[in-house]
Amino acid sequence: MEQKKDFKNWHQKKIKLHEDKQRPFFHEREVWFASLGVNIGFEQDGRGDKFLRPIIVIRKFNNEVLWILPLTKNIKRGKYYMQISISDNRELSTVILSQIRLLDSKRLQYKIGDTSVDGLKEIKKRLAALIEA
């Protein structure tokens, strides 16, 4: 049975995010909790009252706009997934390569770590292969 999604509360949170004047300082390779909200169908949702989900910054265009990939603690295999390690965390996380997304940096809530330079290179390589397929 599908869990009911809380679009109403997410809409209120999204209004507050939009009105926020401050943006965090961030870099590529960083892993953050971001307010991804409530989404449609199989798109990855955030959780909790701030609708948070861990993400990795794969491309910084400027201080306002970035490409991200969502992460999950569930170990998944296949061409749409890749395991990475995050600094200060012994557990592996799974990058969901098929869910690349453009975000406004206002959605970034707090940094939780980094992945290695080689880790980001491998993510970009696998993502490019997925796009070219």
Where are these regions (language model features)?
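Short, charged beta-turn/beta-strand-edge "cap" motif at the junction between a beta-strand
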Residues: 37-42
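Compact nucleic-acid interaction/catalytic patches
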Residues: 44-88
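C-terminal terminal-subdomain/extension
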Residues: 1-11, 49, 84-133
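Loop/turn positions that initiate beta-strands
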Residues: 28-29
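Short alpha-helix capping/helix-loop boundary micro-motifs
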Residues: 15-22
